[in-house]
Amino acid sequence: CFLFQPIGLDAGLGTVINGELVQGNYHLAGEVKFLPMQLSDDKANLNKTPEGIVELVSKMLITISSIIAPEVFIIYSDMVDDVNVIKNKIEDVFASEVEDFNIEIYKVEHLQEYILAGLMLLCAK
């Protein structure tokens, strides 16, 4: 799963299963802004601080993990410095249920490379 969390805006999630992008009915797959979450503050306020972004991203990824349990998350967000903080929050939730639970999370620093690669793949189809 690839999570794009821009500053001050709603996140989006792209999920690839068996080599195919999941679009869902009405192309709603990945519209994580509709996830019901218990948050410490309004999403609009959380979306403006590094701590708030970590809370939002962690809770989104916990929800996604409980639904489809992806092997890997890839995150793009200018406000996330250390993905290990998010990784630890997710692992804490599942550790009591799943022995040796471990999730891989990577941070993308430069989004342009992935945009170009995605466009090239679309053109090749």
Could you say what each language-model-derived stretch is?
Residues 1-39:
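Phosphate-binding/catalytic loop of phosphoryl-transfer enzymes
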Residues 21, 39-125:
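ATP-binding/phosphotransfer module of carbohydrate and carboxylate kinases, centering on a glycine-rich
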